[in-house]
Amino acid sequence: MEDKILTKEEVLQNGVCFEEELDWGGEFYEQIVCENELGEEVPYTGLAYDLYSDGQLEFYGYIDNGYRHGLAVYFYSNGKIKRINNQDRGSAEGIQKEYFENGDIKSVSYCIAGGKILYKKYDETGKVIEEKTEPTEDDFKIAKKWGVDLSTLDINLK
């Protein structure tokens, strides 16, 4: 299932600007925080975004209790999608996609806890230039540690 990419209008209507209303904080400055009505730093939950200086959308993503969690989308300054990441508490999780500025796919990977388990990288003509299509024994161990059974997954890197 393909993630729904929000329009700029949806992002601006439902999110908050990271640069204006959020900051890094919490333990080890690893959380995204905001101030509550008492002026106290609290972990942020919701949709956050950043804009380029010309007002174009640079990034949007979902934050849960201060951590990037769920879909995060990055854009080139021309408005085309640069990268689509799914995250779990700030780590890459599931399918990750990166695009060339012309919109063609640059790479696609499957990640668990931030580690690339499988991937394909393409050149600008669409030719595969590097790939890892089978998990290693270590990948199976890492996946099991995180509760993922790689032997039952049907992962399509397209």
Residue ranges and their predicted role:
Residues 1-158:
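Glycine/tyrosine- and acidic-biased, solvent-exposed loop/turn segments at the edges of beta-strands
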